Structures are given as structure tokens and as C-alpha cells.
UniProtKB/Swiss-Prot annotation:
The keyword Metal-binding applies. It catalyses: [[Fe-S] cluster scaffold protein carrying a second [4Fe-4S](2+) cluster] + N(6)-octanoyl-L-lysyl-[protein] + 2 oxidized [2Fe-2S]-[ferredoxin] + 2 S-adenosyl-L-methionine + 4 H(+) = [[Fe-S] cluster scaffold protein] + N(6)-[(R)-dihydrolipoyl]-L-lysyl-[protein] + 4 Fe(3+) + 2 hydrogen sulfide + 2 5'-deoxyadenosine + 2 L-methionine + 2 reduced [2Fe-2S]-[ferredoxin]. The gene is lipA. The keyword Aminoacyl-tRNA synthetase does not apply. PANTHER family: LIPOYL SYNTHASE, LIPOYL SYNTHASE, MITOCHONDRIAL. This is Lipoyl synthase. Binds 2 [4Fe-4S] clusters per subunit. One cluster is coordinated with 3 cysteines and an exchangeable S-adenosyl-L-methionine.
Length: 347
């Protein structure tokens, strides 16, 4: 039996992963902390009121940029997921009991932080009859109720692609419905054993058919090829995905899937160009781009590309079209210059 540092018995896949040391990062995997006035105000509010965001608790490298623009992400449904993905740092196991007061608290946090755009994500809740559909929908409703000028992005699990559960979530009318595909078919089962590639595409297709702006994410560096990435992008576009984010996999701990390759900024630029050529209305691609990165900007961009007017109460999001995108690959190339192929090495 192999035991982790916290005394928990490792899963077989975790024990196998832990045989590979943590990888050393290439020079372009870095951020610069710029603490502007909006960030400092957000920080003071969060600290003073004991609020909780994914941004802080997951140590997101983009927190300074997003908070400066009054954007933040929240994790709902508890801290334990009923499924395990080999890249994800959220622990898996038996989830905690459903907290029906959580939607109100999240909505009040959004108000206290003065957010212009909020992303709501969470754990998978296969233990519940509705797989958490009510919770995901109610958080969106409460945020809209208490914060009519705040856009909401709902990043959800697949709810087993049950139409009646998806309907509950869709009817809450988030500005963006997001469901992340994450990887390519060949390695999907190994990386996300409790999910199904085609089922995830069907969930996105259902949201698109309902009339929602849709979004998904791809993580590179877990064993896929460039050609497979392009095919996955094509599958997402055919399913009706409006917004696409593409990012580099960064290994949370030694128990997670080893990094197979460092994807150069030039490849991220090429994927972004290919995505626009396929007809994606909005794309953000770069090593430290995360699925919620610059989400308000991407929503506004997608709305404009689809010929839709941004509602009057969210018209301030038009300003985000000119905001910063420090982690976009084109900006990294401007900052660091051309990159060299960097083999995976270990600390």
C-alpha cells in the first residue's frame, strides 16, 4: 500500500504518477504581480469580510489582472468531487451534504466584492438525485437577483447529459454556459475516466440549441498531439461552442498526471488562429490562460461576433474589449521573444 503525504492511501494511478518527479517550468511560465487600485480594494474587501474565491484558494496566477477588472470565480457544491480527473487538484470521494444556503452567500459575496462579472464552477455531485442541477441554477438566479449589473458564467459538470437536468440549469439564463472538454479522444478515458468525450459535446450542443452563449476549454501537455488538438477544436465548433480557451497543463502535485510536453507560445498562437478560421467568435490561448481568464471580455466579444446586443444592464462589459490580456500567447511572444523547444525536465 502506498500512502500520500497526508496519510491517505493512494489510488493505483496516483501511486504510478508519483514515480515521476515534479517538472521544472520553462521561462515563459511566469507572471508579474501588478497590484492596481481595483485589486487592492478587492483584496481588502475579501480579507475584511472573510469571503472565499477560487482565485485565492487555488493560487491562480492571474488573480491580479482579473481582480483589477472586477472579475472573480467561486467554487460551489463543497470541496469534494464525486469524480476524479487526473489533472484536477480538487479532492475526490464522498461529497459533503448539500448546503442550500450557499447560493445566497455566493450572491452576497459578489455584491460585497463589487464584481462586474462572476464565474461559478463547482464539483460534480453524482450523489444527488439532480446531480447538483438545482444548486448550479440557483446560484445564477441569486447572483442576478442581488446583482442585476453583474454577468454570470456557469461552468458546470455534464449532469450525465440528462435533458431534464440540463433544462433546470439552462433556464437560470447565465450569460455564458460553460462545460469543459479538456482533452482529446485518444487519451480522454485515461485523463477523465468518469466523463465521456461525446457526452460532453452533446451537453454543449444542447446549450447552444437552447440559445445560450457556450464555452469550453482544452488543456495541452497531457499527451495529445497538435493534430489531435485541431480535431478537438473542430468537434467543439461543430457542437456549437462560441468561446474557446486553450491552456498549458500545470501539475498540481506528484500524484497527478505527469506533464508530457511544454507547449511553446507559438503553438498557442497557431491554435488561436486556427480556431478563428473555424469560426469561433471568441478565443483566448496561452500557457497560463485559464478557462475563467478574461471571461467578461470573451462574453462581450462573442456577443458582438454573433450580432447580439449586450443588455443595457451589462453594457459596461463593452469596455472589457479593450482590456489587458497579459497571458495571451501573442503578448508573451512580444514580451519574451521567440521560444525554443523545451524538453520536460525535473526539479
Amino acid at each position: 500500500m502506498t500512502v500520500s503525504a497526508n496519510g491517505r492511501r493512494m489510488l493505483r494511478i496516483e501511486a504510478k504518477n508519483s514515480q515521476t518527479p515534479i517538472e521544472a517550468k520553462p521561462r515563459w511560465i511566469r507572471t508579474t504581480a501588478k497590484m492596481g487600485p481595483e485589486y487592492r480594494d478587492m483584496k481588502n474587501r475579501v480579507t475584511g469580510m472573510s469571503l472565499h474565491t477560487v482565485c485565492q484558494e487555488a493560487g491562480c496566477p492571474n488573480i491580479h489582472e482579473c481582480w483589477e477588472d472586477r472579475e472573480a470565480s467561486f467554487l460551489i457544491g463543497g470541496d469534494t468531487c464525486s469524480r476524479r480527473c487526473d489533472f484536477c487538484q480538487i479532492k475526490s470521494g464522498k461529497p459533503t451534504p448539500l448546503d442550500r444556503d450557499e447560493p445566497r452567500r455566493v450572491a452576497e459575496s459578489v455584491r460585497e466584492m463589487g464584481l462586474k462579472y462572476a464565474t461559478v464552477t463547482g464539483v460534480t455531485r453524482d450523489d444527488l438525485d439532480d446531480e447538483g442541477a438545482w444548486l448550479y441554477a440557483e446560484v445564477v438566479r441569486k447572483i442576478h437577483e442581488l446583482n442585476p449589473n453583474t454577468g454570470v458564467e456557469n461552468l458546470t459538470p455534464d449532469f450525465s447529459n440528462k435533458p431534464e437536468l440540463l433544462q433546470i440549469v439552462f433556464e437560470s439564463q447565465p450569460e455564458v454556459f460553460a462545460h469543459n472538454l479538456e482533452t482529446v479522444p485518444r487519451i480522454f478515458k485515461r485523463i477523465r475516466p468518469a466523463f465521456k468525450y461525446e457526452r460532453s459535446l452533446e451537453v454543449i450542443r444542447a446549450a447552444h440549441d437552447y440559445g445560450l452563449i457556450t464555452k469550453s476549454n482544452l488543456i495541452l501537455g497531457m499527451g495529445e498531439t497538435e493534430e489531435e488538438v485541431v480535431e478537438a477544436m473542430r468537434d467543439l465548433r461543430e457542437a456549437g461552442t462560441d468561446i474557446l480557451t486553450i491552456t498549458q497543463y500545470l501539475r498540481p502535485t506528484s500524484m497527478h498526471h505527469p506533464i508530457e510536453r511544454w507547449v511553446r507560445p507559438e503553438e498557442f498562437v497557431a491554435h488561436s488562429e486556427a480556431a478563428y478560421d473555424m469560426g469561433f467568435p471568441a478565443v483566448m490561448s496561452g500557457p497560463l490562460v485559464r478557462s475563467s481568464y478574461r471571461s467578461g471580455r470573451l462574453y462581450a466579444q462573442a456577443m458582438r461576433a454573433r450580432g447580439r446586443e449586450i443588455p443595457e444592464n451589462l453594457s459596461h462589459l463593452n469596455e472589457k474589449l479593450d482590456g489587458s490580456t497579459q497571458q495571451e500567447a501573442t503578448n508573451l511572444l512580444d514580451k519574451y521573444g521567440a521560444s525554443e523547444e523545451t524538453p520536460v525536465a525535473y526539479r
